[in-house]
């Protein structure tokens, strides 16, 4: 999915970031349908400000809260150099639960670090080292003996069972991936239909880490010799996912449920709308799940207060206000309520009798009006009793344990094994190169420059389905073939249209993947729709999913979420689409460079502010000193307040683009292959950390 980046504009041959303090960070091109903590892997992947979900590769940043993720889709880390791995311990570094003083920017939670072993980079270094271990060294580290009796066919069964177990954790997990549960021997009636819990205790973290260690030991018992190339790839992928997950249990689970990025209620209408109704039984299961929503809502105040009291991470007043705006919409007692209108639209699309349709609509409306709305109204009143709400959220690294969490978050977003400082320096160098190129082009071709500044250009297609057809025709010859698949553009019901969503790709259910759907918000401004259709459709996420499937991927691979890989690819083709729009090549390059620089600058500021503790002086030095932009110290204070609540928001889009671009170009040069061949080799691997991509790119997966 796509996210809208920090606004950038070309002025007098020098790029200038436009009024950052007025930039709405959540005003994205599109947004993932599900950014909730329960399932960061949404089934729908919108073009948005966020992170992706199972909505194709992406939604909000596709990261999960430690303690809530499926074991097959762990989290990710990032930081300092990679020394020899330290012995794995059972105890998480999370401090004991305490009740801190009120959290404010001046007193951000239970004691800012660093302390010995906390917020000093050593935790990230430890996990980077574990991620890079060979299978043999990993066995020594975890005290595991190879079981030579296990064969390749046993590993196949292991991977199949792993997938089934991971999606059988709850009804909400299962419907993200499976159309026919019976074909996987999943008893739907026995599933957990609840929406999960709203907070994670220290005990939960310890239990979660112990469980992950047991999964690591189980994996490492399988011999690597004798496996097929695809099996070896999945072996490495899953080991990485598990180490990342263990790291996630070793950091404090900072979460802000009133933050638009983490808000558990903001996308609930779209999430429920994407539940597939193939038969009447699906509607009945939907009702069973819907009826548990009030219990989750009732627990929310406790979860928010627990987060504040034990981790010192509190929402601010503006978030509370925005959250209450969402509650107003959800409490709408008319038929235009998103939980009623969206459901009615789904029922109208079913092949059932008029009597059954009427019955289902009435039952849904009754649940919403008599159970969910009263629970939401009671919750709204409970919000008044929450203590510790701040005037402004402080940068993540200013909280005790915050830097360790941020290191983990960045690796979870990027899967590249680079420290915060390394990523920041890397992006700074990219910005310098892009700005120099931009200035050079603008000086040589002022007509192209003014055409861009004045918006004096038009894309060759403006309707979503027309754009996808155009891109298939024009970009198709230079990219891997999509194959003989069915796809369609479908529009959200009017009542579900949201400002934050432009479009998203709905990842097909794995046992019924014939139809690929790109969901579009017809009420959104169509600016950027051309690139968004490339990002979500062809040659973006839709091609990504189908090439991985064609390469013989295992079901469980679809539960792995490496946003640096998936969003990096989607951003690459999003920008490449401009080259096929019929523009003067200099105008096309100016459009691309401005977009790249805008994303990169915001990512750099995020890394500096939330990761390294930049204050107004450091922000000023970067924007006014390094880049030569006109910003005051007061402006820079405003930038910090804008970015502090959204750690890691754009990093997978910004840095992911550059790493994917470098990976493909490097492979072309080293192997003397075409761009199309390099893209196919990249996409056949599927979601993976970049060191795994480098290891397996070009492998023959038929062997």
What are these model-derived regions, one by one?
Residues 111-703:
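N-terminal maturation segment of proteins
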Residues 25-117:
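Intrinsically disordered, low-complexity repeat and linker tracts
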Residues 10-12, 548:
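Enrichment for repetitive, rod-forming helical segments
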Residues 1-10:
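Bacterial Sec-dependent N-terminal signal peptides
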């Amino acid at each position: 999915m796509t996210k809208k980046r920090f606004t950038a504009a070309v002025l007098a041959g020098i790029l200038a970031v436009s009024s950052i303090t007025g930039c709405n960070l959540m005003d994205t091109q599109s947004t993932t349908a599900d950014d909730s903590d329960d399932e960061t892997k949404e089934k729908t992947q919108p073009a948005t400000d966020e992170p992706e979900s199972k909505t194709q590769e992406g939604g909000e940043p596709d990261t999960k809260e430690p303690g809530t993720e499926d074991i097959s889709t762990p989290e990710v880390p990032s930081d300092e150099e990679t020394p020899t791995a330290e012995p794995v311990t059972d105890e998480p570094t999370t401090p004991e639960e305490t009740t801190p003083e009120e959290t404010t920017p001046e007193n951000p939670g239970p004691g800012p670090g660093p302390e010995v072993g906390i917020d000093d980079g050593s935790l990230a270094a430890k996990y980077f080292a574990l991620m890079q271990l060979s299978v043999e060294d990993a066995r020594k580290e975890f005290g595991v003996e190879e079981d030579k009796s296990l064969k390749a066919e046993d590993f196949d069964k292991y991977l199949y069972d792993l997938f089934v177990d991971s999606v059988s954790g709850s009804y909400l997990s299962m419907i993200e991936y499976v159309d026919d549960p019976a074909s996987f021997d999943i008893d739907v009636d026995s599933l957990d239909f609840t929406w999960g819990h709203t907070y994670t205790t220290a005990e939960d973290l310890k239990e979660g880490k112990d469980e992950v260690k047991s999964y690591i030991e189980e994996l490492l018992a399988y011999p690597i010799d004798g496996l097929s190339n695809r099996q070896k790839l999945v072996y490495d992928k899953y080991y990485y996912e598990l180490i990342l997950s263990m790291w996630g249990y070793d950091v404090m689970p900072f979460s802000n449920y009133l933050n638009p990025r983490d808000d558990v209620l903001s996308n609930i209408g779209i999430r429920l709308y994407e539940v597939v109704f193939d038969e009447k039984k699906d509607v009945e299961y939907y009702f069973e799940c819907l009826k548990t929503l009030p219990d989750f809502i009732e627990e929310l105040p406790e979860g928010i207060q627990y987060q504040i009291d034990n981790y010192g991470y509190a929402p601010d007043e503006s978030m509370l206000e925005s959250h209450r705006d969402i509650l107003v919409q959800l409490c709408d007692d008319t038929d235009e309520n998103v939980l009623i209108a969206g459901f009615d639209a789904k029922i109208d699309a079913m092949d059932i009798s008029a009597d059954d349709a009427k019955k289902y609509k009435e039952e849904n409306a009754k649940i919403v009006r008599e159970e969910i709305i009263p629970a939401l109204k009671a919750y709204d009143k409970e919000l008044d009793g929450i203590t510790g709400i701040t005037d402004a959220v402080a940068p993540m690294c200013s909280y005790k344990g915050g830097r360790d969490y941020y290191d983990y978050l960045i690796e979870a977003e990027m899967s590249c094994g680079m420290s915060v400082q390394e990523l920041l320096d890397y992006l700074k160098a990219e910005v310098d190169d892009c700005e120099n190129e931009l200035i050079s082009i603008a000086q040589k071709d002022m007509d192209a420059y003014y055409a861009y500044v004045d918006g004096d250009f038009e894309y060759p297609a403006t309707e979503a389905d027309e754009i996808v057809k155009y891109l298939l025709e024009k970009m198709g010859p230079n990219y891997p073939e999509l194959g003989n698949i069915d796809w369609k553009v479908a529009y959200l019901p009017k009542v579900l249209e949201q400002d934050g969503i432009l479009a998203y790709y709905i990842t097909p259910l794995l046992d019924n993947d014939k139809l690929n759907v790109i969901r579009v918000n017809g009420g959104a401004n169509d600016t950027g729709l051309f690139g968004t259709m490339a990002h979500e459709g062809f040659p973006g996420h839709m091609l990504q999913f189908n090439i991985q499937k064609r390469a013989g991927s295992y079901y469980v691979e679809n539960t792995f979420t490496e946003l640096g890989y998936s969003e990096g690819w989607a951003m690459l083709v999003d920008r490449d689409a401009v080259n096929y729009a019929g523009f003067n090549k200099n105008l096309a390059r100016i459009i691309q460079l401005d977009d790249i620089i805008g994303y990169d600058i915001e990512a750099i500021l995020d890394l500096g502010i939330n990761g390294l503790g930049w204050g107004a002086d450091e922000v000023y030095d970067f924007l006014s000193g390094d880049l030569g932009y006109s910003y005051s110290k007061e402006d820079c204070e405003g930038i910090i307040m804008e970015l502090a609540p959204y750690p890691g928001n754009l990093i997978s889009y910004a840095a992911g683009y550059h790493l994917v671009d470098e990976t493909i170009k490097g492979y072309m040069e080293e192997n003397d292959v075409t761009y199309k061949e390099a893209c196919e080799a990249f996409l056949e691997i599927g979601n993976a950390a970049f060191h795994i991509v480098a290891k397996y790119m070009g492998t023959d997966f038929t062997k």
